Curated annotation (Swiss-Prot):
Zn(2+) binds at H581, H585, C683, H687. It is found in: Cytoplasm. The gene is alaS. Its EC number is 6.1.1.7. It holds the Pfam family tRNA-synt_2c. Belongs to the class-II aminoacyl-tRNA synthetase family. PANTHER family: ALANINE--TRNA LIGASE, CYTOPLASMIC (PTHR11777:SF9), ALANYL-TRNA SYNTHETASE (PTHR11777). It catalyses: tRNA(Ala) + L-alanine + ATP = L-alanyl-tRNA(Ala) + AMP + diphosphate. Binds 1 zinc ion per subunit. This is Alanine--tRNA ligase. The lineage of its organism: Bacteria, Pseudomonadati, Pseudomonadota, Alphaproteobacteria, Rickettsiales. One of its GO terms (cellular component) is cytosol.
Amino acid sequence: MKESNLVGDIRKLFVDFFIKNGHQLFPSSPLIVKDDPSLLFTNAGMVQFKHVFTDASNANVGTAVSSQKCLRVGGKHNDLENVGYTNRHHTFFEMLGNFSFGDYFKEFAVELAWSFVTKELALNKDKLYFTVYHEDQETFDLWKKISGFSENRIIKIKTNDNFWSMGSTGPCGPCSEIFYDYGEDIEGGLPGTPEEDGARFTEIWNLVFMQYNRKSDGELCALPKKCIDTGMGLERISAVMQGVHDNYDINLFKDLIKVSKKQSGNTNNELAHRVIADHVRSAAFLIAEGLTPGNEGRDYILRRIIRRAARYVYMLKYDGALMYQIFPSLIDEKSYAYMADYYPELINAKDLIISILKIEEENFKDTLVKALPLLEKELVGLSSGGVLPGDIAFKLYDTYGFPVDITLDIIKEKGIKFDEQGFYDQMDKQKERSKLNHSIKSVQQLKGKLWVDIKEHYGGTKFVGYEQYSTRAKVLSIIYEGDKSTEVANVGDRVNVLLDITPFYAESGGQKGDTGVFNVIVRQGKELLSCDDVVEVLDTKKVLDTLYIHECVIKTGSLIVGDIICAEVNCEKRKNLCANHSATHLLHYVLKSVIDRSIIQKGSLVSDDKLRFDFSYGVALTKEQLTLIEDKMFSLIRNNSPVVTHICDLKEAIADGAVALFTEKYEDHGVRVINIGDSKELCCGTHVRYTGEIGCFKIVSEASVACGVRRIEAVTGQHAIDYFREQEKMLHLIAESVKSPIDNILIQIDKLNRNNQELKQKLSDAYFSVINLQGIATDKIGSIDFLYSSLNSVPIDVVRKFINEHLVNDMIMFFSNVVGRNVMYVIGVASNLHSKIKATDFVEIIGEVIKSKGGGNNQLAQISGEYIKEVDVIFHVKNKLINVLRN
């Protein structure tokens, strides 16, 4: 294998060739598509240029080249279940592509393709074949002229395989594919023949000629600006260049599989190693873009990928997490699997990737251990061609969280079919059983129709809360009980109120809604001299994006549709909200600056009394890191930097470095950017004018909330001062309790702890004496010393400690400890006996007798339950031991 045939070198060769031929290099767009709701992930090179293809006449770029990260899991393109079983399917892959947006068309596209494969790649011309759409005589003639091939090497295809379209309407056109012949040793026929599904002839490049626009009636009209979109799978062309027929035999995958085999200690089961190698890449890139395993949307796709790989790790009989040990090859310059030169995000997020892979795989192992034996038991009576009942798969999914796609994987390997309809019938029944969900949905539907009607009638609410805290407004609508309109609300009524204009911020972007009051000032055209009609605003929500709904209670008088009111925001709460929201932006910036630049916001809550910030990070922050964060925050607050807001187009904001959240929806035009020093974020929330208004900042907690997600809770301003005072008060109380001055408190506590430990040891020694005095019986069962005793009210930790200190080889210790009407059984088994019997084995036997459950490990386990005569339990324990020795 030539050194220039490495995957990274082929990528560079492609990119450099097209740059040399006048193309502009575009970096890979993210896998997570943020502006196309029809796609979960980027699945082709043309995705980032979709808007250009649909409006090529106004394109500001003529030609482009890219190597695009792609993921095909879920939706129309889903290769997950095929990975490992075929030579060419991957979840993650790279697509090399060159593009023209009204610049050049077929002839130059064909010339470039021919030049690259025959000169740059130096492929044997005798190994190449072309396909064209059967009505595309122009491309047929171009290939014939440029390549000099005879007509039997240029194959006309009548199917839609050679006609590409973006959808049922829109840009479309014929395409031409380049095929590589692997030779007669491999089965398969030419494209268009009955044997075309064989592996001999492999498509290596697809050239799409977008020359038509398909109308809704199916008519094809010529596009004013014709475009080129090509795609060449990097892994597939690498296999050709490296002289192998299987993508998993290229250097990149061989290195990943090599590490998988070495770390697992299992060189067999090639299928498992292939799946693991593929899924490590997919998971790593998704985590690098900020995803964490979850139960919905893209997060669930990531979880499925990791769990599918974890199941194959389990098949290797490897006792531990494996994926995180394979990932470092992707960022190791000495490895053929090295990808971080082109995708530095892998290095930036390496700690997070390693942490999430390890934690998620370890967590799923528990599910596998419980669920797999149950599935295997159900499959015992099924032979190849049999059908697994859908209710069994549903039980595994519903009770144990065992993904149905993994069940499908397992039965596929055994040639067993799946009762898919039965599975979904059970899913439907579960939904029907959930009356709560049904009722909530019904209410939402009623509310939804009401608000749609209101929006159609009145339009959206004008929000003026960025500039002012109060305004005159007109009451447009009053709603009660969620879905009923009324003209009048009286004292004590709780209602939702819609105004034509409001200074009240509606909850969104993590920020809580404003509270405050309405005072009626004009009724039926008459100015009111006194404020007898007062409405308290408890919260403000947003419905259908533009309706600001005020949740209110009538405190005095009444409220009538048509009233003119003075709407006043609670200024103190709003100022606290502003301080906490600006502090959240600064915290995001500081975390990226001083902890890890790959950190991504996963969620936030901004209320008037605290802020909460969730972020992607795999391990707990140290005390030193938390102090560093606070110091940096204090510095930014003291700088008293101005908070600058400006409005611009979304693309302009992103290009300028503004942080956007994939969980939020943004308009293409008129997005709001908040600049606080070097922090830039798209945000619709309210903020302070200067950072000094935040006052101070204190972290009150830092903890894990999900796999790979940490949460910081903090307070600012007066709430931070109150927190400091509470801590000081607590310190004084502790000092009084331990009878020590504050500056000597740690020494005094240390002294008390030492005294406490000495007393605990004396108490433990006393209980040890009690255990010995109560008597320990010994039976010889084979070569094993079986020691047992009945105790009364001895602390369980003392019993466990006694066993740990006295257990020796060839010994089993069994203690019952009666406390009131309950009894605790503790069993210790010497380590040299674990191959025959474990402490948890006895727990299972005792559990059957006393109808209870326990736990522990191989050496020490315990179980408690209602007291039963001692002899009964000891009999079962001894009987279990005798049966083990006999077998």
